[in-house]
C-alpha cells in the first residue's frame, strides 16, 4: 500500500479526511434512498472502474473474489496486508465511495479491531462488511457480547478519525446454516438487532432468499437490510418493493467473469475457435481509456 494513505497514523502528512468523510456520508445516504442500492462486487482496480463507468454510485468489494484473484481460497486465508493492499488499489482507482468486505476484521479483540479500523480507513475505504463467524467448527459464532463490542470499536474508532464508516454487520445464521431451522429467524433478529444498537448502519443476512422471511426480517430489524443475491432470490425490483435497502452479489460477478474465461479456454482447446472470445471482449481502446485516468 502506498504510504501517504497511512501517514496520518504515523505522524506525518495528513490525508484528506474531509473528502473521505463526505464519501462515507454519501454511502450512508444511499442506504436510505428511494431505490435499492445494487452492488455487483468488485475484486480489483479494473472491475471497480468498470462498475463506476457504467454508473454505479458506490463500489463494494468481495473478500472471496479478492482472495481468488490473488491465489487464495475464501475464509480470511489472504493476509491482512494483502487484503488492505487490494482495497487501497481499488479506492485509488475510483472516485465513488468504496465499502470493503473485510470478513471478521483480522482481529479477535475489540482493541485489535480498532487498530484494523485505522488501517482500513488509511486504505481509503469508507464502509465495511463485518461478519460474526469464527471459522471454528465447535464454536461457529463469535459470542454476541464480544461481537457487539467489536462493532462499537469500529464505530468509535472511525468517528474519532473523522471518517464515520458505514458498518454493514453480517450474521451467517442462514448461510452456514447455524442451529435448527425453526430457530434461525429468531437468532438472526437477535444478532442483527444487537448489531444495529451497537452502531451498525446496515444489517446483512446472506443465505436468505425466501420472500416471506425477507419481508419479515425487514420489519423486525428496523434498519437497512442487505441481501446477497443468488439463484432463486427475488429480483432487485421485488427486493426493493419488499423494503430491502441493499443487494450485493458477493463473488458472483467475479465467478461469472471466470466462467466466461473458462469457456473461452475450453473453446480454444476443443474447437480451435476464438468466436466466444470476440463476442465478449471489451474493446482495447475503451479499456485503455478507462484505465488511463489518473489515480487518486
Report the location of each language-model feature.
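Short, Lys/Arg-enriched N-terminal segments with co-localized hydrophobic residues
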Residues: 3-14
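Extended, intrinsically disordered, low-complexity segments
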Residues: 16-20, 27, 252-296
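Alpha/beta enzyme core
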Residues: 18-30, 37-97, 104-227, 233-242, ...
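Short, surface-exposed amphipathic charged segments that create phosphate/polyanion-binding patches used
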Residues: 241-243, 263-264
